[in-house]
């Protein structure tokens, strides 16, 4: 089990808490908590817990690409059980859409 942490600049606070996906083979769970009210830090703090070691660069690249286009501030928790980069991107987009109340 490996834990990775990242911080990305974010332009908008996530308005809602979100839970998408499940921790199952080839999938991952994402928990998103909005920043505390009154917080001045506008960053996306990401913690990845993964069952697959050695993919630090891949995780960084996938997350950087996502947060470049979707900069939602908050605490992101990703619990991975071997998801491919495509599944990770899908779940991240689902979480962002749910946090914004269905608005892309």
What positions do the PLM features span?
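N-terminal intrinsically disordered, cationic/polar leader segments
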Residues: 1-104
């Amino acid at each position: 089990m490996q834990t990775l942490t990242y911080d990305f600049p974010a332009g908008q606070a996530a308005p809602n808490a979100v839970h998408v996906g499940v921790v199952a083979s080839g999938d991952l769970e994402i928990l998103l908590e909005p920043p505390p009210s009154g917080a001045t830090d506008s960053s996306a703090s990401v913690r990845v817990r993964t069952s697959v070691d050695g993919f630090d660069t891949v995780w960084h690249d996938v997350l950087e690409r996502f947060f470049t286009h979707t900069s939602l501030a908050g605490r992101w928790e990703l619990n991975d059980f071997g998801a491919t980069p495509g599944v990770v991107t899908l779940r991240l987009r689902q979480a962002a859409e749910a946090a914004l109340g269905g608005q892309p």
